[in-house]
Each structure stands twice: as C-alpha cells, then as structure tokens.
UniProtKB/Swiss-Prot annotation:
Gene Ontology molecular-function annotations: ATP-dependent polydeoxyribonucleotide 5'-hydroxyl-kinase activity; double-stranded DNA binding; polynucleotide 3'-phosphatase activity
High-level lineage: Eukaryota, Fungi, Dikarya, Ascomycota, Saccharomycotina
Primary location recorded for the protein, binned into one broad class: nucleus
Cellular compartments annotated: Nucleus
Protein name (record): Polynucleotide 3'-phosphatase
Length: 238
C-alpha cells in the first residue's frame, strides 16, 4: 500500500508512506489542488452521480486522447517541485464507527484508485507526490455541542470547537490546515528551518455554481484560499 490511511471522526486522509524527495529550496513547492468526484473520476454506471460500489468508478476522459490520470502524470513529469492534493467533500460517508458501510466503501474505493495510479507505467512518481483528504458527514453521535474529542492517533487532546465538521468541509478550508501540517512533517528537515513555502497554482473542481452544478462549494473554496479556480474542462481538455 503506497499511502497511510488515517480516519478521524471529521476527516479521512491518505498520505504517502514514502513521499518523494523534492528539492524545493527557498522557492517552495508548487501545489496543484483538485476535487475528486466528477473532476478526476466518475461512476462507471451510467446516469448516476455517486458510485454504487468501491469499484464503480473510472478516470474521466474530457477529450478522446487522454484521461485525467494522463494529465496528472504530465504535471508531475513537467514540474519537479509539484505536489498534487485532492480535497473532497463526502457527505454520504460516516466514519463513526470506522467500520461503517459508507466508510468502508469509500476507503476501499480510494485504495483501488491509488492502486490504479501505481500500476500505470507513469504512476509510480505520482503516487509518491499525491495527498488525499475527505470531509465526511457529522455522525449523530457527535452533536453540535460536543466539546472535546480525544484523538489517540494524533497524540493530542483536540479541544474541538462545535463546528469542526463544518470547518473541514468545503468551502471552508480546514482540510488545507491538515495538508500543510502533513507536508511539513514529510519535507521539513527540522523545526529550526522556516516553514515550507507553498505556491498554490490552482484549485480545480466541478462545483462552481453553474446551472448544471449541484453547488458552488469548489469555487467558493478557491476564493477562501485566495487561489485561482479552474474548471475540469480547462485543465483536462487541452
């Protein structure tokens, strides 16, 4: 398995077990950020919005020549300081308990997604520079007035404000804070060195408030990050 899976009540993340060494020096890392569903992948089953099973997905072809996977590999091939991160809202997934049907389906889906990338002839490098974060639904066991949650996996007592589930969900930017911390852990040599500079190239997603879109969470997310927003057709159609 190329990635470490971490499941928290309010966040699911897949981080590279062996991040590729990147010579980022003072110029920092170039961050290419994406949504997942209907941006990079879509269900194989026709005329549905959400996958019916963990294997019911495919990379999207916005043109007849290349898939979204091809474009992601091109980014890595052409930019030696690139990292790719996926931020996804998963309102149909509940992580308490971790063995819930929806959580198991989603995590198995991402494991198959990562396996498909690694099995591609150009995917090995991409897999070591790919980070994935998902914001699940607030479970009923965590009421809005829940004041404190202890996360053994983080080695800390998280004095949670009552809106933590909403703050990690797009268009809020809470997932980004976890991504930044994980990057620091992966690439920062010591605490004495300045934090890694992140150059946000763009955020690409399909929820842009158009008539055909189900929401505007992606374009608002980019606005809250002060990052240029791109439609999938702009990135994957060239």
């Amino acid at each position: 398995m190329s990635h470490k899976l971490t499941i928290l009540p309010f966040l699911i993340k897949f981080t590279p077990k062996f991040p590729q060494s990147i010579d980022h020096d003072e110029h920092g890392l170039n961050v290419y950020a994406f949504d997942l569903d209907h941006t990079i992948i879509k269900p194989k089953s026709p005329n549905i919005s959400f996958s019916r099973s963990a294997s019911d997905w495919q990379f999207i072809n916005f043109n007849s020549k290349k898939s979204t996977l091809d474009y992601l590999c091109n980014i890595i091939d052409n930019d030696p300081t690139a990292v790719i991160v996926i931020f996804s809202n998963q309102g149909g997934v509940i992580t308490v308990p971790r063995t819930s049907k929806s959580c198991t389906k989603y995590t198995n889906k991402i494991l198959l997604f990562l396996k498909a990338i690694k099995n591609d002839e150009r995917g090995e490098t991409l897999s070591h520079r790919l980070w994935l974060y998902a914001a699940p639904k607030r479970p009923k066991t965590f009421a809005a007035n829940h004041s404190k949650i202890t996360f053994a996996s983080l080695g800390e007592s998280y004095n949670n404000d009552p809106n933590i589930f909403e703050k990690v969900r797009k268009p809020m930017t809470g997932m980004v804070e976890f991504f930044k911390r994980d990057l620091e852990s992966a690439y920062r040599v010591s605490e004495q060195i300045s934090p890694i500079k992140l150059n946000w190239i763009y955020y690409c997603g399909d929820a842009a408030g158009r008539k055909k879109d189900f929401s505007d969470s992606d374009i608002k997310f980019a606005e809250n990050l002060h990052v240029e927003f791109k439609y999938p057709e702009e990135i994957f159609h060239g």
